[in-house]
């Protein structure tokens, strides 16, 4: 289990493609407060990750603490969003597809 946002994004690019993410082609940017920005390029469920603040189809903001609680399954992404701990801009529908990508 990753210990930090940086470690999470470094590991994400080396994961095998999730069956639920087949057919998903999109770009995401995660802006993690005080830690940095990572851009995920998804092509038919295959993920490439780079540390970048470049434009993306879906942009997600959160603190590192909130992100890691979601990654560890200690908090739901939807619950964090509804509580205002996570903000989303751009194609919000793509944020919902993250479950498929990260499963």
Predicted regions and their residues:
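Feature captures hydrophobic
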Residues: 1-103
